[in-house]
Amino acid sequence: MLEAINLSKSYNGTAALHPLNLKIEPGEIFCLLGANGAGKTTTINLFLNFIPPSSGNARIGGLDVVDRSLESKKLLAYIPEQVMLYKNLTGLENLEYFTSLAGGEHTRTELAGFLAEAGLARADADKRVGAYSKGMRQKVGIAIAIAKKARALLLDEPTSGLDPKASNEFSAMLKKLSASGAAILMATHDLFRAKETGTRVGIMKHGHLVATYATSELGHADLERIYLEHMHD
C-alpha cells in the first residue's frame, strides 16, 4: 500500500505540494494527471525519499519512507521517464546487478525468465543496453520490479515517447503487476493511457489534488472534458 498523510513540500515558502492525503491499495493503479509543475513529480519524489517532506508522511507498506528508509525501499520499484541502466552491460547483466543491490540472489536462468515475463526476448536480453529502444529499457525496469517482488511501484511519465504498441505492452505489464498485489502510482500527461491503465485517476493543479475518479465510471471523452474543466478553473 502507498499512503500520503498530510504530505506537503515547500521551497522557500512556496508550496510545490499542498497537504496531500491519498491511499493506494494493493492491486490499484492510480494515475496522477496534471500540467507541468502541478506537483506530480514532487509527489513521486517524496515517496522515493529523494526529497524531505515539509510536513506529513509518505508510507510504503505501512513504513515511513524517512524513518524506515532502507526497509521501505526493499518493497519498492521505480521506473522514471528514462530508465537508468548501464549501456555497456546487457539487459541480463543489468538485471543481475540491480537485483543484487536489493539483496536478491537469482540464477541467470531465473533472471532471463523475469525479462521474458516483462516481454523482452531472450536474444535481446544478451544485447548491450546501449542498443536498446526506450521500450526495451522499460521492460528491464519492469523485470527489476518482478524480480524484487515489489509491493509498490512508482512511475514518472513511463510511456512518454513510446509508440502505441510499446505503450499497450507496458500497460498490460502494469496491470499484471497490480493483479499480483502491487500498489502502483503513475504520473503521466497521457489521458488515454491513464484511462486505459488506471483503476483511479487524480487531477493535480498548482500542488493540490483537486479531484479523483474511478476510471470504470468514465469514458475517454468524459475524462478529457473533466480534465480540461479543472485546468481552466
Model regions: which residues?
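Conserved ABC transporter NBD signature motif
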Residues: 56-67, 71-72
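Conserved ABC ATPase "signature" region
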Residues: 96, 100-103, 108-124
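Catalytic Walker B motif of ABC-type/P-loop ATPase nucleotide-binding domains
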Residues: 153-156
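Helix N-cap at the start of a conserved alpha-helix in ABC-type nucleotide-binding domains
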Residues: 164-166
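H-loop/switch region of ABC-family ATPase nucleotide-binding domains
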Residues: 188-189
